[in-house]
Amino acid sequence: MAAQAQQIQQKVEYFVAQIDKELSRYPALKKFEQTVPVPKAYAALGAFGIFTLFVFFNIAAGFLTNLLGFFVPAYFSLKALESPQPQDDIQWLTYWVVFGLFTFLETFINIVLYYIPWYYTIKTLAIVWLMLPQTQGAKMVYSRIIRPVFLTTQKTVHQANASTPAAPAETH
């Protein structure tokens, strides 16, 4: 039993060390760790735990999911704009199109969503899936749903505009 507990402790320590290594890439978190006597990995895990509990128990869940859906992608979008590679620009531009569409649609069905248990937990997971470059969620939604609808709509609009005679310019 003690050997199993020691194995679990080693795995947890390795996991925390990996998180600390990843978080060390961000100067703001390094500065945070120097200012506050809490290791950045523990602070990040604590913040993640509190965020998860709040969303799960629907405490300011709408605000928190929109905060996650805006600030994290906004940060990486700004970084992408400053980088020379166009691929990361595509990732974040696609994310914003999908996120914007879902946010827009959500305003119309908000009354129905109130009755769906764990809606904000599901929404949080969806936002994470959409934004992670590893999952390419936004790209998948865009290419399978939004793009085909857009191309069909665009074609219809162009045909309607082509068949409509131009109005004469007003002269005064």
UniProtKB/Swiss-Prot annotation:
<comment type="function">
    <text>Required to generate and maintain the structure of the tubular endoplasmic reticulum network and the vacuole. Induces high curvature in membranes and causes membrane tubule formation. Involved in membrane/vesicle trafficking.</text>
</comment>
<feature type="transmembrane region" description="Helical">
    <location>
        <begin position="111"/>
        <end position="129"/>
    </location>
</feature>
<keyword id="KW-0256">Endoplasmic reticulum</keyword>
<feature type="transmembrane region" description="Helical">
    <location>
        <begin position="91"/>
        <end position="107"/>
    </location>
</feature>
<dbReference type="GO" id="GO:0000139">
    <property type="term" value="C:Golgi membrane"/>
</dbReference>
<keyword id="KW-1133">Transmembrane helix</keyword>
<dbReference type="GO" id="GO:0005789">
    <property type="term" value="C:endoplasmic reticulum membrane"/>
</dbReference>
<dbReference type="InterPro" id="IPR004345">
    <property type="entry name" value="TB2_DP1_HVA22"/>
</dbReference>
<protein>
    <recommendedName>
        <fullName>Protein YOP1</fullName>
    </recommendedName>
</protein>
<comment type="similarity">
    <text>Belongs to the DP1 family.</text>
</comment>
<feature type="topological domain" description="Cytoplasmic">
    <location>
        <begin position="1"/>
        <end position="39"/>
    </location>
</feature>
<keyword id="KW-0333">Golgi apparatus</keyword>
<feature type="topological domain" description="Cytoplasmic">
    <location>
        <begin position="81"/>
        <end position="90"/>
    </location>
</feature>
<keyword id="KW-0812">Transmembrane</keyword>
<feature type="topological domain" description="Cytoplasmic">
    <location>
        <begin position="130"/>
        <end position="172"/>
    </location>
</feature>
<feature type="topological domain" description="Lumenal">
    <location>
        <begin position="108"/>
        <end position="110"/>
    </location>
</feature>
<feature type="transmembrane region" description="Helical">
    <location>
        <begin position="61"/>
        <end position="80"/>
    </location>
</feature>
<keyword id="KW-0472">Membrane</keyword>
<feature type="transmembrane region" description="Helical">
    <location>
        <begin position="40"/>
        <end position="59"/>
    </location>
</feature>
<comment type="subunit">
    <text>Oligomer.</text>
</comment>
<feature type="topological domain" description="Lumenal">
    <location>
        <position position="60"/>
    </location>
</feature>
<dbReference type="Pfam" id="PF03134">
    <property type="entry name" value="TB2_DP1_HVA22"/>
</dbReference>
